[in-house]
Structures are given as C-alpha cells and as structure tokens.
A protein has these predicted regions:
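Ordered, amphipathic secondary-structure segments that act as subunit-interaction surfaces
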Residues: 1-5
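Helix-start/capping segments and mature chain N-termini
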Residues: 7, 12-199
C-alpha cells in the first residue's frame, strides 16, 4: 500500500508544503474481507444527513490523519461481534464506514451516499467503479438511503482502495443478500484482482 500525505506546512514557520510517503504491505484482513465478506454494525454518527451544509467548518468530507473516531468505531463494532461499523445519520440514513464507502445494489442500479452536506468522504474507488458500471450499462447514482435499504437490497459492499470490494454479509445481525457472480463483476469493474468469495 502506498500512502502519500501532504500538508501546507507549519503555519508559524512559513516552511511551505510538507509531505511524506510510506509503502507497506496490504494487511491479510483486506483479502479476507474480500473473500469472506463483513458482518457490520450500524452506529449513530450523531449528526443529521445534511449537517455539514450548515456547518462547513466541521470539515465533513475532508480526509485527515486523525483516526481516533474511526478506531473507536471499529473497536465498538468488534465488541458487538461485527467486523466493521456503518455510520448512520441521526435521521436514519446509511452513510459510510470509518475507512470505506458504501455501495448498495438494487437490480442494475448501484447506489452510494452523496458527499457534500452528508460529510461523507469522496471515494476514488466509488468514482472508478461507477464510471465502469455505467459503461457496462448499469445505472449508478448518489442518493440518501435508509438503513433498511441495505438489508432489503440485492447486495451491499464496503469499498476502499486498501480493502477493495468487500461484501456486507450481515448488518446488525440481519443477512444481506450476496451474489458471488455479481461480486466478481463488481470487483472487476473497480479494477481489483479477482479473489474467489466464500459463500
């Protein structure tokens, strides 16, 4: 995994742009999530789905190196017997995971949460996958989804550049439909190597 971090530099020294690069092997858990899927627990993020429209200073949708909330959510998910958390707005909309975006399938339609007012981080993996899906004749859209739509779907995934395309197998203990053939197609559309999923 290649990670590039850039900052505008130290404010008090006028040093200019500062950056560093790290290269580390992908964790085995990333491949395991692609193969076996994830059991996910929903967690209230504590803000409405449009909270960041009125409060841009909260920096919703900004990638930072402050991972305390993300790590705390993952620990809470594990305490609940899940692999991962799915943040939910205070008004009941599915948002994103701490380090991954959400894709939900309804037939030939792929849906993800919009960025902007939701505070959801823009995802390179979503952009790549949705562009390829539309070229393949699918409909890909950004819209708000109730948590129930994740379970009442034709499949759902948490996606990121590190994790790849990981199917959600259950949400809050409720089984989420899984189609192994479509999972392979979605993995291919996103540009990740195929990893045979375990049913």
């Amino acid at each position: 995994m290649l990670k590039l971090v850039l900052s505008r530099g130290r404010e008090d020294h006028g040093v200019g742009v500062l950056g560093y690069l790290t290269v580390t092997p992908l964790p085995e858990s990333s491949f395991d999530a692609r193969r076996r899927g994830l059991h996910v627990a929903s967690m209230d993020r504590g803000t409405a789905a449009d909270a960041y429209a009125k409060a841009p200073w909260l920096l919703g949708g900004v990638k930072t190196i402050a991972y305390a909330i993300n790590l705390a959510a993952k620990r809470e998910a594990e305490q609940r017997g899940a692999h991962e958390a799915l943040f939910v707005s205070a008004d009941g909309y599915a948002l994103e995971a701490p380090t991954a975006a959400l894709i939900v399938r309804h037939g030939d339609e792929l849906v993800t949460t919009p960025t902007g007012p939701t505070g959801v981080l823009a995802s390179v993996t979503i952009a790549t996958t949705f562009e390829a899906a539309e070229k393949a004749g699918m409909y890909a859209t950004h819209r708000l989804m109730r948590v129930s739509e994740v379970v009442d779907s034709d499949g759902a995934w948490l996606v990121s550049s590190v994790r790849g395309i990981a199917p959600i197998r259950s949400l809050d203990g409720k089984e989420v439909p899984f189609d192994a053939e479509f999972h392979e197609q979605l993995t291919d559309l996103a540009g990740f190597p195929k990893v045979r999923a375990v049913r």
